[in-house]
Each structure stands twice: as structure tokens, then as C-alpha cells.
């Protein structure tokens, strides 16, 4: 059942979140968990949790983010576990550090699951309305959020505002060379007046674009001409609180474009909105349209197309890999040139959507804007792409919006060494982005530590201390850690000689020195299953504990060496740069460096070092300046 609040008097909320997408839902729930009286405003309650593009959650790096969101008591992992119809762990042939949990979703089931969670959330109310403006007042001489204005003219007072507008901020849809349609998603109106309001408040808006493929009729596909892609035999849940996946599992299928497909696209590039001057803005580099693939990779004779079912009871199939903004007739011709799709029926055409974003260098690591206190941005408004990236930002923005209401609470900031969410936010606020930002494992310096299996071990206690995590989840973590500690202790107590191992057919360095069972895990060819064969008593531990300790033991030698790197990183991160520093007074800094530092306003030496164009010499000059400033301050006191 949906609940709509009808406003008959002026209401006041501690936190208001605008947008019911993946960032908005996580932000609103996070603020509510911390204890703030929270309002989520969405243009359509029935669209809360909508998967606007591909019907899938997770992937390489992205799947780790979903686990991190779940470890902080977020919603996405719980929702996808109720909607997963095809689950797999990507990169299983490689090490656990790059495993990528991914699940194909039943669109309707995911949306329903998210709405059920959000609409029943403690401290959280939901309003179906459109926000067109917000006002500020002065707090200690600086502008601070005071209220939001709805399209109906009503005013809501609030001290904290989170904007999670997705592709709706100044959204415009394009198909072919036809005039663009103002929309944030097909059939949904954009937030045009809110975009103008941000400009009026001094924010410089840029434009980005993304696209979506046509949807095709399941019954019109020749499945015998495609290759079946089965999911994992035993699906792995995303949430650390889920015991199992509940829905039946189905297969996905693979086909390929061909030279005829590419010829059709090439002959119509001049008609595609994404290639014409109609939409001359940056698109996702790592999720290109079929037009971009044909134009950028002319040497490729084919590209994979994944045929992904959109639901157990749905006749709609998502052809992943052929996002397009060609005219509708060209889209159908292109589809029918693909093996297995010769007689396909198109249920909905593809399109490109362009939208506004704000340079994320306008933000602190809390995702609060530098211009206006109490104003936070999360999701595509910060220049990112992807459900998972949006959810990760949402939980940080919502938590900090609520925590900042009290001076007794420290900000909730995740470091690069602690989470992929921390890597993403640091990249955004330090480097900015000129194209839709997507997470990859290669962006993380400490990916051996930032794995999908240990997200709860890394983050749940931190979230609990911030008031973001429930007693139930913390209790689950506590019990898991207790069992893992007992298992590690048992493995350290148990030892064996290389000679005895060789009798069992296991060969390691024959130096005569005993090895503990835990040390053996660091050997490339020795797994936890082998240890169980050697010491059957280990079977008394749960499979979850055995798997977790097995991975920790495998990486232990490398993690010990990486700990020194992390310590060095933390020392730089903890070397804070005062907010009132004047870079023009730092001796030896070039004018260019001064301008870059003044714009970025890095909070630490580490953040300053990551700004493009800031040299080691410039960093040394800043450190010397801060030391001199510190000595002068000490003498004056």
C-alpha cells in the first residue's frame, strides 16, 4: 500500500531527500537510521526503486559497493536478494580481490521490494511532489539550507537537504534527429526549475548523457540461435543478512552483432542523436552505444549482445550491448540483422538522455557542498553512472546530513583504504570528472583489502559507532568475528612438517620447519578444503567462517606488506590542511598550482597530492608552510 502525505500546514523536517532512485532511497533510509526526522520527496511514489536502464545489480567493483552499502545497513542488497533471477560471481577464475557479485533482477520484484522497505521505514515519510527551489539563511555568516519549495507552492522547512535527482535534472531525451523531449526517463517529466534554482544559487552546471537499448519481445527471439549463459549453481546473496535467494533462477543468452549490423549503423550515424551535434556532451566511456562502438572500433567484426530477461512473468528482454539513439526504424533494422533476432519485435525503442550535473569538486568528502551548508548531492548529479555508485553516495550523503545536525557527532567519511565508496568519493571531490564516472577495481590502490567477502568486517562496526547500523546487524557481525577468531586460533595452534605433508601428496619447501595450518593457506596450491582433509575437526566450523578465513589466510602475507603502505597513506590523510589557508601565501607555489588548490580546497596533504598537476615540489612547499604556521601559532600562544 502506498502512503501519500497531504500537506495542509507548514511542516518541518530535519532532513529532506529529493529523488526516489537508488541514491535517494539510500540517503533517506540512512538519515532515518541515524535518527533524523526525514522526508523523501519523489515525483511518483510508484517509481521508487525503478531500474531505469539495465535490470541488474553488481558486477566487478560495483558488486563490492553493494556489499559495502549492505554492511552499513543499506537497502540495495536486501532488495536485490528478493528479486534476483540470475546470480553469478564474475572473475571466479581470478583471486577473491576482483570477484564481482552480480545479479539479474526481476524489475517488478526489485521495485516492489524497495518500495516495501522504504514505505515502512521508521523515521521516514514519503511525499509525492516536485521540488522546484530551496532557500537559505545565514548561519555564522555562511548560507545554510532553510526550506524547499514545491511546485504546488507549499514550503517545507528543513535544516538539511539531499539532492539525488538522477537524470531528471534538466533531463532531455533524444531519438534520431527529432527534437528532444524534456524528460528524465521515458514518460517522466524532468526537474527543469530545480536546475535553474541551482544556477541561481551559484552552482555551475555541466551536461552529461547516457543511453538505453530497445526492449524486445521474448516470444519473437530464436533462442536456438543463441548461446545459453547459466548462473551459478548455488546463487550467492548480496546481503550479509540473507540466507538464500528466494526466486527461481533463469538463464541469460548471448548473441553477436555482425558486419551487416555495423553497416546499418555506419550508414545511419548521421541520423543518430548520440553522434550528431544534437547531444554534444560526454557519454559513459565504458558503456558505449552501438554507434560509438562502430565508430571507435572499426576493426571489430562483432560485439557481444547479452539477452537478459526483465522478469519471470515479463515478456520483455533487455539486449545489453546495443544502446542506441538511432531513429526507430533504424533500430529495428539493426536488431533484425543480429543472429537469433531476425524476426524480433521491439516493445520499446532505445534513446539517449542528457542531463545536468554539478562539478563534484564543489563538495566535501561528506558530500556536503562547499557553497551552502546543509546541502548535499548524491548520485548522477555528481557525475557518476550506475545504480551501485549512486547507492554508495546516497548512504554517505544521508548519514552525514543527519549526523551534522548535532555537534556531538563526527562526520562519516570513508577513506580510500577502507572502502570502494571511499575511493569513488575521493576521486570525485579531488579530481572531478568530465565524463560519467564508473568504478573499477583498478581505481583502488588497496583492492586486496577491499573485497566483497569482507565488506562487513571492514565497515559494519564503523557504521554501528556512527549510529548507522542496527543492533541486529552488529550482533550478526559480532558472532561471525567470534567464530572466525576461534578458527584462526585453531589454525595457528595446528602445525605440520613438510615431510608429513609430502606423504599426503602435498609438496612445499622441504626445509624441515613446521608450518602452521594458517601459514599453509598462504601457499598457492593449498586451500581450506585441503586443510579440512588434513584436519577433519575443522568441519565443526561453519562454511561461512571457513570460507572467510580461507581468503584472509590466502592474502595474509600480502596484506601484511600492504599495511605499511596504508599507514603511510593514513599519515598523509591525517596531515590536515586548514580550511582558511591562503595558497597565495605559500612560498614557491606557481599561479596554476594556487588556482587548482584554491578550487579543490583539499582537506589533507594526501588529497592535495592527488590533484592533477600538483607536483611533489608543491606538496613540499605546502608542508613547509604549515610547519612554519604551526610554529608561529605555538609561539603566539
UniProtKB/Swiss-Prot annotation:
PANTHER family, alphabetized: GLUCOSE INHIBITED DIVISION PROTEIN A, PROTEIN MTO1 HOMOLOG, MITOCHONDRIAL
Keyword Nucleotide-binding: no
Protein name in UniProt: tRNA uridine 5-carboxymethylaminomethyl modification enzyme MnmG
Protein's organism: Anaplasma marginale (strain Florida)
GO MF entries: flavin adenine dinucleotide binding
Gene3D superfamilies: FAD/NAD(P)-binding domain, GidA associated domain, C-terminal subdomain, tRNA uridine 5-carboxymethylaminomethyl modification enzyme MnmG/GidA
UniProt cross-references to NCBIfam families, sorted A to Z: mnmG_gidA (TIGR00136)
Any GO CC annotation of this UniProt entry: cytosol
Amino acids binding FAD: 19-24, 131, 191, 380
Function: NAD-binding protein involved in the addition of a carboxymethylaminomethyl (cmnm) group at the wobble position (U34) of certain tRNAs, forming tRNA-cmnm(5)s(2)U34.
Protein family: Belongs to the MnmG family.
InterPro entries cross-referenced by the UniProt entry: FAD/NAD-bd_sf, GIDA_C_N, MnmG, MnmG-rel, MnmG-rel_CS, MnmG_C, MnmG_C_subdom, MnmG_C_subdom_sf
Cofactor needs: FAD
Keyword Ubl conjugation recorded: no
Amino acid at each position: 500500500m502506498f502512503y501519500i502525505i497531504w500537506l495542509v500546514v507548514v511542516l518541518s523536517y530535519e532532513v529532506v531527500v529529493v529523488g526516489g532512485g537508488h541514491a535517494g532511497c539510500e540517503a533517506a533510509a540512512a538519515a532515518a537510521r541515524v535518527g533524523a526526522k526525514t522526508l523523501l520527496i519523489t515525483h511518483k511514489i510508484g517509481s521508487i526503486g525503478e531500474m531505469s536502464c539495465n535490470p541488474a545489480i553488481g558486477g566487478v567493483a560495483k558488486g563490492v559497493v553493494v556489499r559495502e552499502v549492505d554492511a552499513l545497513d543499506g537497502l540495495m542488497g536486501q532488495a536485490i536478494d528478493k528479486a534476483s533471477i540470475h546470480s553469478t560471481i564474475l572473475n571466479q577464475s581470478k583471486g577473491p580481490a576482483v570477484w564481482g557479485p552480480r545479479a539479474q533482477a526481476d524489475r517488478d520484484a526489485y521495485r516492489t521490494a524497495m518500495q516495501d522497505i522504504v514505505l515502512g521505514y521508521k523515521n521516514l515519510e514519503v511525499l509525492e511532489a516536485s521540488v522546484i527551489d530551496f532557500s537559505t539563511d545565514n548561519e555564522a555568516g555562511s548560507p545554510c539550507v532553510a526550506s524547499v519549495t514545491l511546485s504546488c507552492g507549499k514550503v517545507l522547512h528543513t535544516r538539511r537537504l539531499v539532492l539525488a535527482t538522477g537524470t531528471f535534472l534538466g533531463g532531455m531525451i533524444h531519438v534520431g534527429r527529432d527534437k528532444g523531449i524534456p524528460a528524465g526517463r521515458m514518460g517522466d517529466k524532468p526537474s527543469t526549475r530545480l536546475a535553474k534554482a541551482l544556477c541561481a544559487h551559484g552552482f555551475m552546471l555541466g551536461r552529461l548523457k547516457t543511453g538505453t537499448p530497445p526492449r524486445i519481445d521474448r516470444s519473437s527471439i530464436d533462442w536456438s540461435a543463441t548461446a545459453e549463459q547459466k548462473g551459478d549453481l548455488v546463487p550467492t546473496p548480496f546481503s550479509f543478512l540473507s540466507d538464500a535467494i528466494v526466486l527461481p533462477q533463469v538463464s541469460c543468452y548471448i548473441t553477436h552483432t555482425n558486419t551487416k549490423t555495423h553497416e546499418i549503423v555506419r550508414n545511419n550515424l548521421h541520423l543518430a542523436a548520440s553522434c550528431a551535434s544534437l547531444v554534444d556532451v560526454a557519454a559513459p566511456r565504458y558503456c558505449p552505444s552501438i554507434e560509438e562502438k562502430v565508430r571507435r572500433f572499426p576493426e571489430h567484426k562483432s560485439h557481444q549482445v547479452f539477452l537478459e530477461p526483465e522478469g519471470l512473468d515479463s515478456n520483455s528482454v533487455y539486449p545489453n550491448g546495443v544502446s542506441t539513439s538511432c531513429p526507430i526504424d533504424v533500430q529495428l533494422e539493426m536488431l533484425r540483422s543480429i543472429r537469433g533476432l531476425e524476426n524480433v519485435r521491439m516493445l520499446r525503442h532505445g534513446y539517449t538522455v542528457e542531463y545536468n550535473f554539478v562539478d563534484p569538486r564543489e563538495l566535501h568528502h561528506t558530500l556536503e557542498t562547499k557553497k551552502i551548508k546543509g546541502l548535499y548531492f548524491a548520485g548522477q548529479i555528481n557525475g557518476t553512472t550506475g545504480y551501485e555508485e549512486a547507492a554508495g553516495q546516497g548512504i554517505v550523503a544521508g548519514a552525514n546530513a543527519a549526523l551534522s545536525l548535532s555537534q556531538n557527532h563526527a562526520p562519516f567519511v570513508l577513506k580510500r583504504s577502507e572502502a570502494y565508496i571511499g575511493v569513488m568519493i575521493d576521486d570525485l571531490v579531488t579530481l572531478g570528472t568530465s565524463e560519467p564516472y564508473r568504478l573499477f577495481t583498478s581505481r583502488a590502490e588497496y583492492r586486496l583489502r577491499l573485497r566483497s567477502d569482507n565488506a562487513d568486517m571492514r565497515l559494519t562496526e564503523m557504521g554501528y559507532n556512527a549510529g548507522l547500523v542496527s543492533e541486529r546487524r552488529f550482533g550478526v557481525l559480532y558472532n561471525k568475528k567470534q567464530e572466525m577468531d576461534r578458527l584462526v586460533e585453531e589454525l595457528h595452534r595446528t602445525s605440520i612438517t613438510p615431510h608429513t605433508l609430502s606423504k599426503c601428496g602435498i609438496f612445499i619447501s622441504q626445509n624441515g620447519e613446521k608450518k602452521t595450518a594458517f601459514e599453509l593457506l598462504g601457499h598457492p596450491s593449498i586451500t581450506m578444503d585441503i586443510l579440512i582433509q588434513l584436519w577433519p575437526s575443522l568441519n565443526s566450523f561453519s562454511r561461512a567462517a571457513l570460507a572467510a578465513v580461507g581468503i584472509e589466510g590466502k592474502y595474509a602475507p600480502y596484506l601484511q606488506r600492504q599495511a605499511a603502505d596504508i599507514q603511510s597513506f593514513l599519515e598523509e590523510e591525517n596531515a590536515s590542511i586548514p580550511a582558511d589557508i591562503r595558497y597565495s601565501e605559500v612560498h614557491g607555489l606557481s599561479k596554476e598550482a594556487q588556482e587548482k588548490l584554491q578550487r579543490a580546497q583539499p582537506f589533507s596533504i594526501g588529497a592535495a597530492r592527488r590533484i592533477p598537476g600538483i607536483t611533489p615540489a608543491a606538496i613540499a612547499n605546502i608542508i613547509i608552510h604549515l610547519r612554519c604556521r604551526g610554529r608561529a601559532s605555538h609561539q603566539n600562544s
